[in-house]
Amino acid sequence: MRKPTESAGPTQRQQRVAELVRHAIAEVLSRGDLQDPVLSRHVITVPEVRMSPDLKLATAYVMPLGGEDEQPVIEALERNRKVLRQEVARRVNLKFAPDLRFRRDETFDEAARIDRLLRSDKVQRDLGPDRDSGE
């Protein structure tokens, strides 16, 4: 039996609320509701949001399309955090609007690194000629 203090990953409720918050943030960003020159110049993707166990903190992982100007975009989102929080509160029915944090999404970089690794000569040599031909 698992002890209550052990971390087993996010609960179903955390995942459901995280997805609602993700949709709300993405909608605000896509509609251009924020009056910020940095944000208006970029299309920003929000691939993931993670909620704290008490649902009072949401960490949004964001990436500008094309991967350019990541740091200025994150800084602009942090500057507009209060407005975004109000918009999330309007769109998501929760007792408390979660505080928002923004982080750079590194999953694209990690996937590219793994892809480069799998395509490297050393790995291809280890896989042998049968793997390359799909046999």
Swiss-Prot record:
GO molecular function, a single term: ribosomal small subunit binding
Which family does this protein fall into? Belongs to the RbfA family.
Organism this protein belongs to: Methylobacterium nodulans (strain LMG 21967 / CNCM I-2342 / ORS 2060)
Give the matching NCBIfam families: PRK00521.2-5, rbfA
Key words, A-Z:
Cytoplasm, Ribosome biogenesis
Protein name stated in the entry = Ribosome-binding factor A
Assembly and interactions? Monomer. Binds 30S ribosomal subunits, but not 50S ribosomal subunits or 70S ribosomes.
List cystine links: none
Report the principal subcellular site: cytoplasm
* One GO-annotated biological process of the protein: maturation of SSU-rRNA
